[in-house]
Amino acid sequence: KYVDTDKDKVINTVEPLWTRKPADLKEEDYMNFYKALYPTYEDPLFYIHLNVDYPFHLTGILYFPKINDRMTVERNKIQLYCNQMFVTDHVDDIVPDFLTLLHGVIDSPDIPLNVSRSYLQSDSNVKKISGYITKKVADRLEDIFTNERKALEEKWDNLKLFIEYGMLSDEKFCERAMKFALLKNPDGKYFSFDEYRKAIETEQTDKDKKVVYLYATDTEAQYSFIEGARNKGYDVLLMDCELDSHYINLLERKFTDCRFCRVDSDAIDNLIPKEDRTKPELSETEKNDLSDLFKAVLPKDYDYYVTADNLGKTGEPILITQNEFMRRYREMSNMGGVMNFYGK
């Protein structure tokens, strides 16, 4: 049935909000636009409105979605437009890899279309656009850290995967993120890197002048170790993100005068030695005899070492630990590398 009418029929009901000036928009406008684009998703954490016309033309709105773990990650949710005409939702050759975790829209007539991947990656405008978007994301996060610290802390658990991945995969973003990335202890207290360093360096500096960052990955399983550290006056970080083994390695490279130790990787007096060890109480023969005694009753199908060592005056008589380096290396190997984390 055909009906004559002089009214236009609206086919696309989603208004291109990115073409409007940020000053003309309210929070509600941004949230409604997000719901129109992604009706089944939870509200985003933050958003960024992009608007630049020199040395390239770019408009857009990018949203930070909630990311709880790698199972909730979805790539390719950024829609690319050219003068409001949809082009693709695969922008991994246009924006840095970690930014493909964001949602939203970017619109630019300066991004070449129908060209090879290698040409796209070498195009000067694409490089400038990529760098600009990374800078705006870092600017937004730093602004929230400076002016809305409480809001950042409240949403940190949903942001940390994104920020850690960005720091691990993009050097420029990493340098910026060192100012606003947060550390968290089991009590739910948050610190910047500088704040935490100042809080622990007096008590947690070892005899070699290295600041020791103690951390736990499971507060229940490692409860007794956490309490043992606290009884010595030490603080413990909670690092339970799936990328944290890689992240810790990155931080140790950035802060060369520090080291990270999981709180259950040794006796607490050995994790932060304050003075040179005294001579062992047992002779080598006595230590070997004690080791053989334990090996005789331990399971045969596990790899382990039995050693007799000085666990300190207040240490437990027997301690089961996992070597920090070997455990961390195994965790990183099992993950298969940072770039494989999100299916690259």
Describe the role of every protein-language-model region:
Residues 1-344:
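Conserved GHKL (Bergerat-fold) ATPase module
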